[in-house]
Amino acid sequence: MREEIAAAVVFVTRLIKLNDSIPKEKVEEFSSELSSALVEKFKNHWYETEPTKGQGYRCIRINPSEPIDPAILKAANQCGLQYTDLNLPQELTLWVDPKEVCCRYVFVIIVYDIFFNNLFKVLPKHLLQI
């Protein structure tokens, strides 16, 4: 579970780093807080032998028509940041499942394993700069 959460946190953190107005130390603090929040959230909803079980619960959804994801909001608040400071995309879905982290960024679907083996082969060029 920790490896998958780490992959998700790295992805979200890279998106936040695009916002140069947040100091590096705050981004690192946010990353640590998000990791802790996700471990707490997922601990009773992680099924190694049934990875699709609990999939909806483990989904991190960013969309203007939906409430802010509680784990992201908690991590931001713990760091003294506002959610809007993160400058995350308006549309993002991140599924964190055993052995796989999958992201739909706007309308592009990106799938990568927890070791990022294939990440740089499938990312659009504009995301490689994150």
Language-model features: where?
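Alpha-helical bundle protein-protein interaction modules that mediate dimerization/oligomerization
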Residues: 42-116
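Phospho-regulated, Ser/Thr/Pro-rich intrinsically disordered or coiled-coil terminal scaffolds
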Residues: 1-56
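Small-side-chain structural scaffolding
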Residues: 8, 13, 75-76, 94, ...
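Extended intrinsically disordered, low-complexity regulatory segments in eukaryotic proteins
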Residues: 109-130
